[in-house]
């Protein structure tokens, strides 16, 4: 029997609930129950149950475990193990700046191990992102959400081509966007973006750029810069995952080996990555442009900037500190930020990283500078 206790989330296909699986003679097991919403079509039901069938084939500590499937009348539910800390992106945003680099690398190693397992079985995920990775009470990360997964042929160079459906642009390899050709190599690209999400504590990849600007910038050679305090070795691995030629990207077996080596040699994580080069044209157009103004009409405010990096909660701190223009903000250092009463290390890093990016943008942008 399954006893549903509360709703913990919802999506396009239905609700996700927390409950307990009651097995005679055994202790109740906490589970997550994904229920297909009422009024579903037969196609939706088939896709829903296909996801369960895929999950049922997997047995790995870094892949979400299927506990069972319920199909009774019009009822359709997928029952999986319950992950106390929810999705990785939300978990990291809640605990911004609270983990060591080694802990973050440990999380990534788990995700990489799960993806290596899937790749070895001939599966491509196609929707790998921090939102589709779940975290348990011991910080073990498990790959979930197999709604878009597909099996590849035995040929290691095989690719899966699809004619329709939505594509998560910010996490998807260029060839998969352009030609809808998915492979284990396109999953590796997505893993690189997950690495960036983890080191940036759940920040949105490419920030407020439009999907079209993301596509254009990546095509022009732009790659996400290292998050504040990111070790050079980790950013280099991200860049390897983002190689334009999919044949040049590392396989998941190599990715996991690199992460394991870093865990066993913590000194290799001490050197931090340098500030990125000038942004690509599409990135410069889409970013919070210091010359054009944050809201497009030339009125550039400290509040607009803080809102753009999701740090709007510190508007009053900056105002009380006398920082009335971005020109003043650009001269701030770590001590200045701490002096405002911003105590969370992750928030300090995010603010300082954004200031660093703005300085870089000003130095790269051509033409006369406007008064700040």
Curated annotation (Swiss-Prot):
GO terms for biological process: axon guidance; cell adhesion; cell surface receptor protein tyrosine kinase signaling pathway; cellular response to follicle-stimulating hormone stimulus; ephrin receptor signaling pathway; neuron projection development; neuron remodeling; positive regulation of MAPK cascade. It comes from the Eukaryota. It catalyses: L-tyrosyl-[protein] + ATP = O-phospho-L-tyrosyl-[protein] + ADP + H(+). Pfam families: PK_Tyr_Ser-Thr, SAM_1. Residues 2-263 form the Protein kinase domain. Receptor tyrosine kinase which binds promiscuously GPI-anchored ephrin-A family ligands residing on adjacent cells, leading to contact-dependent bidirectional signaling into neighboring cells. The signaling pathway downstream of the receptor is referred to as forward signaling while the signaling pathway downstream of the ephrin ligand is referred to as reverse signaling. The GPI-anchored ephrin-A EFNA2, EFNA3, and EFNA5 are able to activate EPHA8 through phosphorylation. With EFNA5 may regulate integrin-mediated cell adhesion and migration on fibronectin substrate but also neurite outgrowth. GO terms for molecular function: ATP binding; ephrin receptor activity; GPI-linked ephrin receptor activity; growth factor binding; transmembrane receptor protein tyrosine kinase activity. It is a single-pass type I membrane protein. SUPFAM superfamilies: Protein kinase-like (PK-like), SAM/Pointed domain. The lineage of its organism: Eukaryota, Metazoa, Chordata, Craniata, Vertebrata. The keyword rRNA processing does not apply. Its EC number is 2.7.10.1. Residues 297-372 form the SAM domain. InterPro entries: Ephrin_rcpt_TKs, Kinase-like_dom_sf, Prot_kinase_dom, Protein_kinase_ATP_BS, SAM, SAM/pointed_sf, Ser-Thr/Tyr_kinase_cat_dom, Tyr_kinase_AS. Keywords: ATP-binding, Cell adhesion, Cell membrane, Cell projection, Developmental protein, Endosome, Kinase, Membrane, Neurogenesis, Nucleotide-binding, Phosphoprotein, Receptor, Transferase, Tyrosine-protein kinase, Ubl conjugation. ATP binds at residues 8-16, 34. It is found in: Cell membrane; Cell projection; Early endosome membrane. Heterotetramer upon binding of the ligand. The heterotetramer is composed of an ephrin dimer and a receptor dimer. Oligomerization is probably required to induce biological responses. May also form heterodimers with other ephrin receptors. Interacts with FYN; possible downstream effector of EPHA8 in regulation of cell adhesion. Interacts with PIK3CG; regulates integrin-mediated cell adhesion to substrate. Interacts with TIAM1; regulates clathrin-mediated endocytosis of EPHA8. Interacts with ANKS1A and ANKS1B; EPHA8 kinase activity-independent but stimulated by EPHA8 ubiquitination. This is Ephrin type-A receptor 8. PROSITE patterns: PROTEIN_KINASE_ATP, PROTEIN_KINASE_DOM, PROTEIN_KINASE_TYR, SAM_DOMAIN. Most abundant in brain. A motif (PDZ-binding) lies at residues 370-372. GO terms for cellular component: early endosome membrane; neuron projection; plasma membrane; receptor complex.
């Amino acid at each position: 029997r399954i006893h549903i206790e509360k709703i913990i989330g919802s999506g396009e296909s239905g609700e996700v609930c927390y409950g307990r699986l009651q097995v005679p003679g055994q202790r109740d097991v906490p589970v997550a129950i994904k229920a297909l919403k009422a009024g579903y079509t037969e196609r939706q039901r088939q896709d829903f149950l296909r996801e369960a069938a895929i999950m049922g084939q997997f047995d790995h500590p870094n892949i979400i475990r299927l506990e069972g499937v319920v199909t009774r009348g019009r009822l359709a539910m997928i029952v999986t193990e319950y992950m106390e800390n929810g999705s990785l992106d939300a978990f990291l945003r809640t605990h911004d700046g609270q983990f060591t680099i080694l802990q973050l690398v440990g999380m990534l190693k788990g995700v990489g191990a799960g993806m290596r397992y899937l790749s070895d079985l001939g599966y491509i995920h196609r929707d790998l992102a921090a939102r589709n990775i779940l975290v348990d009470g011991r910080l073990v990360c498990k790959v979930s959400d197999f709604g878009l997964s597909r099996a590849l042929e035995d040929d290691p160079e095989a690719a899966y081509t699809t004619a329709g459906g939505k594509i998560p642009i910010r996490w998807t390899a260029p060839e998969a966007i352009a030609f809808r050709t998915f492979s284990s190599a396109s999953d590796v690209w997505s893993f690189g973006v997950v690495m960036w999400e983890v080191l940036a504590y759940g920040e949105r990849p490419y920030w407020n750029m439009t999907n079209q600007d993301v596509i254009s910038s990546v095509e022009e050679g732009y790659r996400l810069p290292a998050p504040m305090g990111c070790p050079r070795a980790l950013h280099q691995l991200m860049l390897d995952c983002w190689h334009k030629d999919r044949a040049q990207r590392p396989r998941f077996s190599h990715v996991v080996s690199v992460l394991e080596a870093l865990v066993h040699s913590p000194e290799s994580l001490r050197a931090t990555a340098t500030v990125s080069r000038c942004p690509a044209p599409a990135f410069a157009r889409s970013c919070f442009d210091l010359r054009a103004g944050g809201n497009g009409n030339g009125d550039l405010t400290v509040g607009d900037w803080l809102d753009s990096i999701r740090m709007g909660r510190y508007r009053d701190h900056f105002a009380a500190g006398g920082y009335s223009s971005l020109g003043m903000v650009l001269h701030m250092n770590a001590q200045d930020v701490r002096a405002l009463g911003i105590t969370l290390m992750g928030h300090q890093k995010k603010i300082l990283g954004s200031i660093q990016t703005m300085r870089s943008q000003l130095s790269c942008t051509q033409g006369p500078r406007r008064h700040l």
